Amino acid sequence: MVSESITPQQWISYGITGYRELVYNPGYDQLFAEEIDPALSGFERGTLTQSGAVAVDTGIFTGRSPFDKYVVRDDKTRDTLWWSDQGKGANDNHPLDQQTWVHLKRRVGKQLSGKRLFVIDAFCGANEDSRLRVRFVTEVAWQAHFVKNMFIRPSDEELRDFEPDFVVLNGAKCTNPDWREQGLHSENFVAFNLTEGIQLIGGTWYGGEMKKGLFSVMNYLLPLKGIASMHCSANVGTDDDVALFFGLSGTGKTTLSTDPRRRLIGDDEHGWDDDGVFNFEGGCYAKTIRLSPEAEPEIYQAIRRNALLENVVVRADGSVDYDDGSKTENARVSYPIDHIDNIVKPVSRAGHATRVIFLTADAFGVLPPVASLSMEQAQYHFLSGFTAKLGGTERGVVAPVPTFSACFGAAFLSLHPTAYADVLAKRMHAAGARAYLVNTGWNGSGKRISLKDTRTIINAILRSDIDDAPTATLPVFNLTIPTALPGVNGAILDPRTTYASVDEWRAKADDLAQRFIDNFSKFTDTPAGVALVSAGPQR
């Protein structure tokens, strides 16, 4: 099928002067044959694995290149974007001038011109009223496969008159030799022009640049329309009650949002508008390091024909060693969302959220297993995006390493973080949603809070049992905590009781509180941020 809607004028606007052959929206069988073609070499060629999935390598680019991300600073973005050279908060939105943009676009256009091109037209966003119609152009079959997996696949009828709102030109094979003179970070680039509606990719083969690039675009467009744009997972219960799960890596977001009694809306990127919560994507992009059928059966079973593995170690017999992280700890698999059985069908959207859960894995042992949050506290902890991991020192002593990521996804924010907190709070208020902080980390006993206890806590939140529980106030952080919950050992609900003395907890709490206070200072460059300071910990 060839789209008649791709006009010569559009190709010119992309900077592409012609092509040898156009492969438009190929099916999975064709992509499978294309990407394992023995005539291919290097990073273009995939390897067939025993599961039926194809595995590809992306070279040194096993993750995003945050220092190589640029956005054209023009009349549209100058006063709206959260720039890396403005304000107190560090981010990846490095400004790019128009002249350099034109140069980069010519580089990518030259690379793609005269080639055999794959074009994938897809939707970003399950809600028709706000979805983005996106066109991906690449000369690499598996990159076409990746975006076919990850985004929402239009029907044949929808493809007939497809007019893109945004275009992604993936020129992974080209680089920018003039980067030094232009004041850029390296020869590689991931550049956005929000006025033209184009993303350029050069030098990096990492598939996630296309996925997260579109998330950054949605993060710019939707909040300006009053629609929440969120880095979270979402599911819905039998009573159509929707829950959102925010959390950084290692907090249990995927594990806790995967529930046999609840249908999955999506695992990573969502919007929330007047109709409810909706998935941006049509697929999943899961980590595979140390993957096992026992620990994560849904993901393991999703790795089959049409799934695409990235940077895994494939043995000579075609089996995959998921425990081998020699290429990267960020090994991934993309697959269509219908590879998961218990999902919302036919469209990945549901009603308004009634429960918003912020997950943290506190290695300091200070935060409670669960706390109910006021609307102001919800915004504060959303902006903080806190978790902590245990890391070894050179002497072998285990010490907590804190991580703060605004809105649980600072790398993908296009506007000031307070804009996302404001829109989320308005959506929560209109829906009567309640927010909770859930700590999946450690307490004073030195042990991690058990998955059994955490699941029981999550169930108490989803069933509203926690709302009727007796409560107390935890000092320093001023959190409302339950003193009893059915099925949970009451001794762990107040973290102070897990220490030999309350003074020991207090010393650690004061230390962690100061880290929160120091981090939150970067949001006080706006009145909205200043207004939320009192909702955080106080020393």
Curated annotation (Swiss-Prot):
Pathway as given in its UniProt record: Carbohydrate biosynthesis; gluconeogenesis
Q: Where does substrate bind?
A: 64, 206, 212, 332
**Keyword 4Fe-4S listed:** no
Chief place of localization: cytoplasm
Originating organism = Sodalis glossinidius (strain morsitans)
- PROSITE patterns from the entry? PEPCK_ATP
Its biological purpose: Involved in the gluconeogenesis. Catalyzes the conversion of oxaloacetate (OAA) to phosphoenolpyruvate (PEP) through direct phosphoryl transfer between the nucleoside triphosphate and OAA.
**Which cellular component, as a GO term, is one annotated location?**
cytosol
What are the protein's UniProt keywords? ATP-binding, Cytoplasm, Decarboxylase, Gluconeogenesis, Lyase, Manganese, Metal-binding, Nucleotide-binding
Kindly give the Pfam families that the UniProt entry links to this protein: PEPCK_ATP
- The superkingdom of the source organism is Bacteria
Q: Under the GO molecular function aspect, what terms does this record hold?
A: ATP binding; metal ion binding; phosphoenolpyruvate carboxykinase (ATP) activity
Its GO biological process annotations read: gluconeogenesis
Q: Share what the entry says about its subunit structure, partners included.
A: Monomer.
Q: How is the cofactor bound?
A: Binds 1 Mn(2+) ion per subunit.
- InterPro entries found in the cross-reference section: PEP_carboxykinase_ATP, PEP_carboxykinase_C, PEP_carboxykinase_N, PEPCK_ATP_CS
**Reactions this protein catalyses:** oxaloacetate + ATP = phosphoenolpyruvate + ADP + CO2
Q: Where does Mn(2+) bind?
A: 212, 231, 268
Keyword Transmembrane helix attributed: no
Protein name per UniProt = Phosphoenolpyruvate carboxykinase (ATP)
